[in-house]
Amino acid sequence: MANTSLKNKKRLWLGLKTAHAQLDLAKLMFFYGDSFENHQIYELDEATEILKHPRFDATKETTLYIHGYIETPEVESIHVIVDAYQKNGDHNLLVLDWGELADGNYLLDAVQNAKQLGPKVATVLIGLFSNGLQRDLFHLVGHSLGGQMSGMVGRSIFKKSKETIKLKRISALDPAFPPFYPAIGTTAISKNDAVMVDVIHTDAGLYGAPRSTGTVDFWPNSGKTLQPGCPKRDYKLLTDIGLKDLCSHRRSWRFWAESVAAKDTPTFHAVKSKSWSDFKKFRVDESYIIQMGLNCPETARPGDYYLQTNGDQPYSKGINGITYEKNENVVFPTND
């Protein structure tokens, strides 16, 4: 008994769970219609039933959204994302509800559960692909820890399919920082997890990834805290965070939702540059402009892209966002 206890303590210190996560607590939600209430919940092992739903349109792109730590379908982010896709109207929207597994201690519970759930979701998606879901019409999107889990899903699909299936696109919205940079018993999302991985950084170095981690990395307003319009933060620990502290981190999904709702209308224009400092000095490649968000081209040239946004909705400044404008009423980070 003493040896078992010691072994468990060692596992805890290493950030390892002593028991397998109850993966059946996670569900898939299929949204249809024009209100949040229009959805149906499926067990992961019954996911292929989604394809039989009368409102599932196999000719449309299917998006799977994975939320972050201590989130559930009841929180604002899910409602904003769902509303945006419903306004767009051109997508089958699935949401992975893993709220009961994304709770508890961040490192010892949520991260470890994500590491187990990612491969399970990969198996579910392979099953969907085998039953008719078109791979070239599938898009995986995740925020924070959900962004990191998206990478886990992509890697697992590639491995489980014996390198025959690679997701077309993963979009990571301010993917979680600890414990992925440096990797401590984990592997961070990377450009290798899908054919194209686009990343939106809004709280880099605090709750979000501190460095470029995709095929294309967007750095709106430097990609760091404070994002324009966000209040001064208290810099609390993950165990005692408030909405004030999460404002910059959450701005990533707000940007994403705005781009989705805009549909084909150009929104967040971004330009390639070596750094935020160079962007402010107009050292940019104006010959190549792309959009941040849903309409980021899947053929985008790899690299780092910068832009400015407004501090409130609409966040997009359109084409004006690629030209730095000093605003005394907005606090920008002083570092590059």
PLM regions: where:
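Glycine-rich nucleophile elbow surrounding the catalytic serine of serine-hydrolase chemistry
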Residues: 140-153
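Active-site nucleophile loop of the alpha/beta-hydrolase fold
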Residues: 168-179, 201-205, 223
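Tubulin/FtsZ superfamily GTPase core signature
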Residues: 152-154, 170, 208
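Flexible, membrane-associating and regulatory peripheral segments of lipid-active enzymes
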Residues: 1-95, 102-113, 122-135, 161-165, ...
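The conserved beta1-alpha1 loop
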Residues: 66-68, 143-144, 174
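Beta-strand segments within the central parallel beta-sheet cores of soluble alpha/beta enzyme folds
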Residues: 137-142, 169-172
